[in-house]
Amino acid sequence: MLFHVTHTHDYQTCMAHREEARNEFNDGFTKAATANNVQIIATYNNRGRHTRIWILEAPDYHAVDKALEPILKFGNYDIMPVSAM
């Protein structure tokens, strides 16, 4: 299944200038994605809007939810199943 995941945060929690938090976010998600059989197809960022978008392939919604678990403290997440056209 394909999923469109949107992550948002605000200026106060932005990781752009906090290298330790940025590494925790990126490494935490990458490791959890691999552990839960979630493949990162694409990643897009809009720095001005404090938004990151992922296209993921996963067996089910639960796998995506588990992959996001280590980074939930960094903001809000919207998980939406999608299909290719």
Language model: regions and residue ranges:
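Short S/T/G/P-rich N-terminal loop/turn motif that feeds into the first structured element of a domain
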Residues: 1-50, 59-62, 85
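A structural signal for short, well-ordered beta-strand segments
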Residues: 5-7, 54, 79
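Short, solvent-exposed amphipathic alpha-helical segments in soluble enzyme
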Residues: 22, 70-71
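Short, electropositive alpha-helical surface patch
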Residues: 55-68
